[in-house]
């Protein structure tokens, strides 16, 4: 009997732990159920939906103008980039073109949004692996950019500044001057971050060869943005399928070689420099003679008339009343419009039945595709690497849960 008992080997049992939903490295309300064999991750099960608000369904009950603020609340780190996709989709269904000055302002603020997003990601990624200084420097610069948002739209985050047909109102000359004055000192801050992190031995040990994604895997999983460029593909919608006035802009697409967390960090650092290049070009074009003019279409059946005009014209008052009560009707049809948001390809599939409300508005969030790959990326890594990988995916739960 004792011999029989002696031959029984105890069964090995994996350990299951919860990561989140209130974990400082979860970047929102993420719950990961991790199955561990010692310190090694065997399986990752993301539990999403904790920030689900039914955005797509809510938009169906709203006019096209009332739908715009919902897009600010998706990727709330860079709000105007999402508004851009929805406005482009509606404009293509309406068959209208945004005036050149309106396009330049849109591109300028989309690049500000890209820097807002990358600054947050790069600095919090550093914080996730133990560095404290980068977030303090990064948030100081983000504060200045938030002020530019506020001076254009009145709001630091939920701007609702883009409109179908253009932008809400023109930028004052002093704001354009201040944005230009911000650019060069910011490049120095990027250089300081670069010096602090890029060659740092501990930072490299935590990121090099961690979370490697091959190019084939990136395409199979529906990745976009930095996740694809980190694996070696120069795929950027601003170059591949130019929209607005991006075709005129001179900028480079940084790509990685290894597809690891470190490459994705380097790409985001370089993209911030390229965004500043685009911003400087936008500012120069806004000051040029051909950059003057209206910032939105002058069809008062789509874009509301100005206050001064409403005090003089009865028709303007009628148009204003109709637009803010019933809204405008969009011709029946369906369209897919995508923009290169900071986190990847943000797409809006808009279906109109000819009424004043969208029949269906399907949102394609880049973070959703990236999060579903957490299982295959993390498998075989250590528990400590999970937060580094999650940080390099750049996920925001407003857009994942919608």
Curated annotation (Swiss-Prot):
Keywords: Cell inner membrane, Cell membrane, Membrane, NAD, Quinone, Translocase, Transport, Ubiquinone. One of its GO terms (molecular function) is NADH:ubiquinone reductase (non-electrogenic) activity. Its EC number is 7.1.1.-. It is a peripheral membrane protein. Pfam families: Complex1_49kDa. It catalyses: a quinone + NADH + 5 H(+)(in) = a quinol + NAD(+) + 4 H(+)(out). One of its GO terms (cellular component) is plasma membrane. NDH-1 is composed of 14 different subunits. Subunits NuoB, C, D, E, F, and G constitute the peripheral sector of the complex. NDH-1 shuttles electrons from NADH, via FMN and iron-sulfur (Fe-S) centers, to quinones in the respiratory chain. The immediate electron acceptor for the enzyme in this species is believed to be ubiquinone. Couples the redox reaction to proton translocation (for every two electrons transferred, four hydrogen ions are translocated across the cytoplasmic membrane), and thus conserves the redox energy in a proton gradient. Belongs to the complex I 49 kDa subunit family. HAMAP family: NDH1_NuoD. This is NADH-quinone oxidoreductase subunit D. It comes from Nitrobacter winogradskyi (strain ATCC 25391 / DSM 10237 / CIP 104748 / NCIMB 11846 / Nb-255).
């Amino acid at each position: 009997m004792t011999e029989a008992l002696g031959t029984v080997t105890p069964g090995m049992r994996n350990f299951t732990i919860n990561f989140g939903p209130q974990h400082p490295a979860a970047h929102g309300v993420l719950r990961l159920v991790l199955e561990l064999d010692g310190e090694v991750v065997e399986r990752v099960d993301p539990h999403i939906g904790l920030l689900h608000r039914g955005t797509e369904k809510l938009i169906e009950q709203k006019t096209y103008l009332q739908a715009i603020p919902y897009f600010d609340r998706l990727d709330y780190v860079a709000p105007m980039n999402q508004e851009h996709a929805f406005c482009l989709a509606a404009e293509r269904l309406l068959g209208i073109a945004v005036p050149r000055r309106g396009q330049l302002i849109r591109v300028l603020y989309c690049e500000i949004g890209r820097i807002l997003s990358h600054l947050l990601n790069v600095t919090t990624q550093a914080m996730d692996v133990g560095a404290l200084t980068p977030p303090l420097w990064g948030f100081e610069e983000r504060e200045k950019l938030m002020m530019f948002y506020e001076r254009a739209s009145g709001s630091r985050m939920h701007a609702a500044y883009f409109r179908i047909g253009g932008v809400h109102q023109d930028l004052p000359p002093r704001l354009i001057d201040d944005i230009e004055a911000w650019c060069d000192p910011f490049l120095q801050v990027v250089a300081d971050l670069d010096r602090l992190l890029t060659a740092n031995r501990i930072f490299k040990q935590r990121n090099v060869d961690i979370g490697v994604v091959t190019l084939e895997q990136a395409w199979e999983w529906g990745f976009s943005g930095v996740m694809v460029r980190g694996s070696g593909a120069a795929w950027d919608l601003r170059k591949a399928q130019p929209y607005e006035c991006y075709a005129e802009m001179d900028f480079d697409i940084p790509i990685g070689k290894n597809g690891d967390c470190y490459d994705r960090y380097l790409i985001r650092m370089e993209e911030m420099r390229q965004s500043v290049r685009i911003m400087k070009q936008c500012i120069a074009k806004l000051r040029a003679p051909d950059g003057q003019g209206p910032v939105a279409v002058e069809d008062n059946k789509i874009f509301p008339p100005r206050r001064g005009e409403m005090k003089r014209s009865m028709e303007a008052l009628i148009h204003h009343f109709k637009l803010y009560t019933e809204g405008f009707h969009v011709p029946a049809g369906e369209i897919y419009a995508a923009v290169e948001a900071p986190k990847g390809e943000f797409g809006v599939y808009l279906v109109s039945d000819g009424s004043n409300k969208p029949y269906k508005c399907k949102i394609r969030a880049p973070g959703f595709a990236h999060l579903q790959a957490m299982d295959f990326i993390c498998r075989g890594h250590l528990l400590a690497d999970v937060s580094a990988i999650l940080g390099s995916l750049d996920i925001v739960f407003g857009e994942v849960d919608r």
